[in-house]
Regions:
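Beta/alpha (TIM)-barrel catalytic core signal, keyed to glycine-rich beta->alpha loops juxtaposed to Asp/Glu
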Residues: 1-162
């Protein structure tokens, strides 16, 4: 990666008023550190969901928090509605009671789980369908209890977490 070329291009875009912030997608912390020598990175768009929580465990999201980099989550619903895995079966069982408790649906619980993370992750819902956008907005109204957050995470992991 030629950081000088990228930095020059971004500086030019900022000077022309074309962009206000600069973000990257799927960058590992080492890539961000390299590029950050020349330019402020404001966002990193990564795959993150209950189906793929590894960025929360491998230090990626911690790195974002330490360096004041916003996290955007693509594929925030993960494979929950696509694959009938043991993990998803355990989560569905938990959701039976949580859907009732929060008067919502599984899609919104998946988004609320992401939104509850203290790093203020922004899910990218990836739809242009009005009904789905309105439904996703309802997830912002859910104040997921921390115990429920951990019960969802533990269901995905298949074990208690400390």
């Amino acid at each position: 990666m030629n950081t000088d070329i990228i930095s020059d291009a971004v500086d030019e875009l900022i000077k022309k008023g074309k962009i206000k912030d600069f973000g990257v997608s799927n960058f590992k912390p080492s890539h961000i550190e390299l590029l950050s020598k020349n330019i402020k990175i404001s966002w990193n768009q990564i795959e993150f969901s209950i189906s793929n929580s590894s960025p929360m465990l491998d230090g990626t999201i911690d790195f974002h928090q330490i360096n004041d980099i916003g996290t955007m989550a693509w594929s925030p619903l993960g494979n929950f509605f696509k694959i009938d895995s043991p993990e998803n079966q355990r989560i569905k069982k938990i959701f039976e009671s949580l859907n009732e408790k929060y008067n919502t649906n599984s899609e919104n619980l998946l988004l609320a789980w992401i939104l509850k993370h203290p790093s203020r992750i922004h899910p990218i819902i990836g739809t242009t369908i009005d009904k789905r956008i309105k439904n996703a907005c309802d997830s912002l109204k859910i104040n997921l209890d921390i115990e429920d957050w951990f019960s969802i995470f533990e269901a995905q992991k298949g074990e208690r977490v400390p």
